[in-house]
Amino acid sequence: MRRKILVIDDNTTQCKVIKELFESCGYSVVALDSPEEALYLLEWKEFDVIITDLSMPWMNGVEFCRRLRNTRPETLIYALSGYIYKFDRNELLEAGFDGIFSKPIRIDLLKDAIEEDLKKSRMVG
């Protein structure tokens, strides 16, 4: 079974790069540029992993994560930001993020974290 990843970033180039990299690793990936669109999609579609930018114009990643945690506590959620220093790490973890990564992304580190967390969730679930 292919694992499903949802990528949310208002930078469409960034979305495309992440999508292509994870697809090349065998994941099924949907990329969106709007957290509102993602919340709508999540009403009827399930994902194993969500990767979201923190700084988006319509809704920031922290608000998105908090809203999602109310309905999808089991979904792995990772934060990305080119301005990670602007965010309080404890606030991000309290919001429910499973991992926090700075841009430019080291895709190998992100992929390793996701695969490790998916293994852990399979053992627990």
Sequence positions of predicted segments:
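Alpha4 helix (beta4-alpha4-beta5 surface) of REC/receiver domains from two-component response regulators
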Residues: 63, 84-100, 112
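Acidic catalytic/metal-coordinating carboxylates
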Residues: 33-37, 60-64
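Active-site beta3 strand of CheY-like receiver
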Residues: 45-51
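Short hydrophobic/Thr-rich beta-strand motif most characteristic of the beta2 strand and flanking loop
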Residues: 26-33, 41
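Charged docking surfaces used in two-component/phosphorelay signaling
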Residues: 16-24
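C-terminal output helix
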Residues: 105-114
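Receiver (REC) domain active-site loop signature in two-component systems and cognate sites
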Residues: 56
